[in-house]
């Protein structure tokens, strides 16, 4: 989903994708050493249709990140690098630019092809909406629960939360101290990747079968400390024919659970797709709107909105 998110944002910004190579989530681990990404840079450098190369990865092993960056520095084409979960990205260099998140990476890539920034809708954060949500939530509703199909989407939202909160946990957190001890029980701010082996061993992927996510949505809705539940909905071939529609009844039930307990509950959705996907992007977003779900315009904004909704004692 990292490469899909990057390609969708490039499409939205008016750019195009000559080649998209999925390296796999473990490629930049110490064990594999970035073999696929290094090969991909070689191939794309030799490809006449490719003018700019963008690299995206879940948190890489530091030694492997250095190896990939060393290769990128000698590439004859401009390279944009987005290694999620890194601390402050390094300063841009000649021919090598760094991005903190997927939206910034897509923007830097399209600007390098000559597209003008002034011509683009950058979808800035909706601060009046953030103020509204903060005013609705009770003082004890201070936690985010992220229920994701896409691993990189989960990572990006989780790292946005980590910039402001210390008590952030996940089943895919590389730091053992922040990894959930029991994936069936959330603690504080919890971000779950339902596509990870923890949940898919012997079961269909959540992009196809929403069963696991539905039961967890209802579980999280019963927690009075939860202010916002975040979910992604991935479009494309091989995904569910109606990824939002299949969750609507569960969303309504979650809202009813909170209402019966006399408290609000914000559900934040993000539909990853384009107007050219087999499922209708506009229709999927409309289903969310009709169900009273706030929807975000990008993976980056999803993480930022969720984080800001539950910030206490701050003014937007």
Predicted regions and their residues:
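Catalytic-core regions of core metabolic enzymes
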Residues: 1-316
């Amino acid at each position: 989903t990292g490469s899909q998110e990057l390609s969708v944002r490039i499409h939205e910004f008016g750019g195009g994708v000559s080649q998209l190579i999925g390296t796999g989530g473990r490629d930049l681990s110490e064990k594999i050493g970035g073999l696929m990404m290094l090969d991909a840079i070689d191939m794309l450098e030799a490809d006449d249709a490719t003018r700019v190369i963008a690299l995206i990865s879940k948190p890489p092993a530091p030694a492997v990140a250095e190896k990939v960056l060393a290769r990128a520095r000698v590439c004859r084409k401009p390279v944009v690098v987005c290694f999620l979960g890194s601390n402050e990205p390094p300063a841009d260099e000649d021919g090598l630019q760094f991005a903190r998140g997927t939206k910034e990476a897509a923007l830097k890539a399209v600007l390098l092809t000559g597209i003008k920034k002034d011509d683009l809708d950058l979808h800035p954060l909706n601060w009046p909406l953030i103020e509204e949500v903060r005013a609705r939530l009770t003082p004890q509703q201070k936690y985010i629960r992220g229920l994701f199909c896409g691993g990189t989407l989960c990572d990006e939202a989780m790292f946005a939360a980590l910039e402001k909160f210390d008590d952030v946990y996940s089943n895919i957190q590389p730091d053992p101290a922040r990894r959930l001890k029991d994936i069936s029980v959330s603690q504080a701010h919890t971000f779950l990747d339902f596509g990870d082996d923890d949940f898919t061993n012997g079961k269909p992927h959540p992009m196809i079968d929403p069963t696991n996510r539905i039961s967890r949505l209802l579980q999280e809705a019963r927690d009075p400390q939860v202010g916002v539940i975040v979910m992604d909905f991935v479009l494309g071939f091989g995904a569910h024919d109606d990824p939002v529609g299949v969750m609507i009844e569960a969303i309504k039930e979650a809202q009813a659970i909170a209402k019966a307990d006399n408290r609000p509950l914000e559900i934040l959705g993000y539909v990853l797709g384009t107007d050219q996907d087999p499922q209708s992007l506009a229709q999927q977003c409309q289903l969310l709107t009709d169900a009273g779900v706030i929807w975000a315009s990008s993976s980056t904004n999803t993480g930022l909105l969720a984080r800001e909704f539950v910030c206490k004692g701050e003014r937007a």
